[in-house]
């Protein structure tokens, strides 16, 4: 399990270092590509050697019980497996109402009108195949829109895109770095690209 951090002052580092003797599967990896969520994820992609790579934020909002079903779908041939809040068995607890509404509307419209095979377009809780990661060039410049970019590109390449239900729980400690009006234009770019997606 890779824990990617930006700088040595990150308070996550000493916590993970204390856990390593009990959990030797944990591995700290410093992000040398530049600060921010995008480069942290890119660092993880570069360092990971497994055939499938799961991305999850370290805020405890994503449901770890969904990981095994996601891995099963990936092993069955999916190149993208999304943890979806908007299918039967999934859901969301907490979070700003406007953010929830826009997220659900984006997922519904992309699924029904843009023919994206998943219902949750904005969650970053996703598993990717190494085949996909090695076969595309990342164009995202901000960060959180990366999941939508990779999903759209997988669809355009004719790869398998799947989803499993998951619950998202709003964080109980700390402060989110997600600022909707900052990230929205970056999401919108890939939102419109998705509507033009056709198999290559």
Identify the role of each PLM range.
Residues 1-8, 27-31:
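Short beta-strand/loop segment that forms part of the nucleotide-sugar
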Residues 5, 21, 113-115, 139-200:
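Hydrophobic helical membrane-anchoring modules
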Residues 5-13, 60:
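A conserved acidic beta->alpha catalytic loop
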Residues 11, 15-18, 43, 69:
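Alpha-helical transmission elements in cytosolic ATPase-linked domains
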Residues 14-15, 75-76, 131, 189-200:
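Terminal low-complexity segments of carbohydrate-biosynthetic enzymes
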Residues 20-26:
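Short helix-capping segments at alpha-helix termini
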Residues 44, 59, 129, 154, ...:
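Residue-level signature of catalytic and energy-coupling elements of molecular machines
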């Amino acid at each position: 399990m890779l824990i990617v951090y930006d700088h040595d002052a990150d308070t996550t580092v000493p916590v993970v270092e204390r856990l390593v003797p009990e959990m030797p599967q944990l591995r700290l990896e410093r992000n040398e590509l530049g600060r921010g969520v995008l480069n942290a994820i890119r660092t993880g992609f570069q360092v990971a050697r497994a055939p499938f790579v799961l991305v999850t934020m370290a805020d405890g909002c994503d449901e770890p019980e969904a990981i095994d079903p996601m891995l099963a779908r990936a092993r069955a041939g999916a190149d993208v497996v999304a943890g979806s809040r908007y299918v039967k068995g999934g859901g969301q607890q907490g979070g700003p109402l406007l953010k929830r509404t826009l997220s659900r509307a984006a997922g519904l419209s992309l699924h029904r009108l843009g023919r994206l095979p998943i219902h949750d377009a904005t969650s970053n809780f996703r598993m990717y195949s190494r085949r996909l990661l090695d076969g595309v060039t990342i164009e995202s410049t901000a960060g959180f829109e990366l999941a939508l970019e990779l999903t759209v590109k997988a669809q355009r390449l004719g790869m398998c895109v799947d989803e499993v239900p998951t619950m998202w729980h709003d964080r109980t400690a700390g402060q989110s770095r997600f600022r909707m009006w900052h990230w929205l234009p970056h999401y919108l770019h890939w939102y419109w690209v998705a509507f033009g997606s056709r198999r290559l």
